[in-house]
Amino acid sequence: MAKSVREKIKLVSSAGTGHFYTTSKNKRTQTTKLEFKKYDPVVRQHVIYKEAKIK
């Protein structure tokens, strides 16, 4: 069975609320850490979400 190229990651809110999104990324093409501006429902604002590993 072939090893998956995509890696599951967690996007953690920089607002410190503990809210996160899960997604996947291609390990070969995306070598840098991902950063997105997404909606945080806890603070009701768009904040920066940074990549973290799923434990």
From Swiss-Prot:
Gene3D superfamilies: Ribosomal protein L33. InterPro entries: Ribosomal_bL33 (IPR001705), Ribosomal_bL33_CS (IPR018264), Ribosomal_bL33_sf (IPR038584), Ribosomal_zn-bd (IPR011332). GO terms for cellular component: cytosolic large ribosomal subunit. GO terms for molecular function: structural constituent of ribosome. Disulfide bonds: none annotated. The keyword Signal does not apply. One of its GO terms (biological process) is translation. Keywords: Ribonucleoprotein, Ribosomal protein. Pfam families: Ribosomal_L33 (PF00471). Belongs to the bacterial ribosomal protein bL33 family. This is Large ribosomal subunit protein bL33. The gene is rpmG.
